[in-house]
């Protein structure tokens, strides 16, 4: 890092409009030689009003600035401190432009010689971080940030993270550092000087034994699993007793019974369904059963879970805790499909790609660092999004494996016999095929949260043709000889002529004409679909915020598909007899497109269930065509039921109408299942009241405003009496946002944080909700399950409507052909299951007390009410108006104390 001084600057302002807003706080942390050497901080007075949002964000109020200097009073002092420093900030353009403008207003011309953006640094240094927001970076790297959005603390935190990043860079192998230096020349800011100094000052030494080299890539050496040596001669009961004792848990006979039941089914190669009530301690039970099975038989067990969160909990928390408690070394590994793991040949190809793109350049640098760290090569560790993900996916699709390639999936195959417990998820379990031979090495499988399997199976059997995807894939080939893969082919043809390469001539002009025609045919195809949408009945899917067309003629679509497939075939003929790697990449891309169109064509010709979706009715670019290729029952039977000798399905909500029959009907093979129920919810249900308002009118679309107002009234009553947090569940984004708008306008909620479900932000929102004492979380179907509601006071879940899927929902349409009565056999069981999962958000421990409010009077007035009443039979139920609701809250509050 040398002896340069870095001025790490953070500003708080009245807003983000450069020509209007003012600085109200400045914090500077000075760094030299990886040490903080000085700090500067000042509030800055302004004549502008500070907007309420900025006051809430920064905790800076106008009275705090009354004694502060104006910027022109400290401008010279600040300038003198930073004029010779490298200017550093997180999202540097904002801070740099504001401070340059402020200096200019004081007749000071500030032009830093070098500028560094820590957002750029942190993306490169920490390639697996889920977020690059300062507060989340600080949390991820163990740095305390007590007051985010305060300039002094933000500047200090940014500086500490920058030091961590620089120290990480300095420890990298020299070859990696050199490649980072060359790539950094294409960045927006002056990081290349930093890398140059690091390379120049590098203490030359042999490559550390923990690394190996593939071509130009330095990567972390993979360490094989040792054969497990779990010496234990006792019973499962004594193993369970030791585990709960060492872990400080309560000995629960029902939890032991669950573990013993699972072990017995594994030992006898049985198929079983187990409903273990929410909060019964399923994870510990099945982990101990799987471990005991391995100890007694030497066989390993696959455990499939619903979410990445639960996967991480098992591998990073539960299994390490068991190892410590039992003094074992359990070999457990996350297992996915082959395509989820990196190959070094693919990284090499990406590094050699001359695509001139900022995000691609960042990706190359991230890959160089990530591959020195990752023990697994799991691509999802990179959390790729947007353009980076699309680029990476395309590179995977067109990658022609290099000779002597190193593929991380082979490490898992090599170590499979020494893995005692394999952890996967439902999507991978269902997707696995013959090529994914790792799955064939497991004879025994435990499926947790098994009620979610049908959703993943439906995703697996549904094929999609998206305008945006096809347009992107075609764009990667290009339209002329100056773009993408066509440019590479053009250069190859020139090389053939100049260097007399031993390959057949390539018809560049014919190829260019063909690609232009393919682009035009694709536009014609989606224009045809767009016309069909405009001429058809369109139904809104509010949950997914799409518009769907379910009934349409396919003749014109098939005609356009045939034309584009025919043109792709003729284009592929241009490369007959040419085996050069550049040609192979283009052929692979063209074949990918051809297969995409061909699969859709074959399914439509066969009359498979299909529908058209469009996000914006006026934009052709948002069109997607979906076709269901296979029956969900066929896939679940083939990919799950027939794959394992012993198979145990576990969930808190497998039963419907006191029976497992609804779940059994998801398989098309008559197989005997042993069924068990482990119910620990009886005691916790006694701590829960279910309240059904009598003063809320039955929901009708025309009275939605009145219905929403009633929900808000009950939220007001609840928060006024309890001052506690509340989860409100909806089946419609429209209703959710109507409630949000009303809450934000009411003075009763000025000291409450109102959080709303957002795409790809659920985990973060849940964290925020659990951290605040006064919070209201508004969510849709996602939050009916898989969400641990934490609160010190009374817990409340309000259910706006019973979670039925609408008959215009795509799932309803796609599954309709698989049932005699879709509502009775699929929709109703699904709604009851989701309702039960919603109840489970409330009571997660014996000490929890809470209340469930269901506004939907179908719970007690419909002809299917008894199916829901069965789920509530252990709960205390009360029907009444809002005054009686308030009275009940006070009673619960009194008991809680």
From Swiss-Prot:
GO terms for cellular component: cytosol. Keywords: ATP-binding, Exonuclease, Hydrolase, Nuclease, Nucleotide-binding. One of its GO terms (molecular function) is DNA-directed DNA polymerase activity. ATP binds at residues 276-283. It is an enzyme of class 3 (hydrolase). CDD domains: DEDDh. GO terms for biological process: DNA replication proofreading. It comes from the Bacteria. The keyword ATP-binding applies. Coiled coil: none annotated. Residues 703-893 form the Helicase C-terminal domain. 3'-5' exonuclease. Belongs to the helicase family. DinG subfamily. Type 2 sub-subfamily. NCBIfam families: dinG_rel, dnaq. This is 3'-5' exonuclease DinG. It comes from Staphylococcus aureus (strain MSSA476).
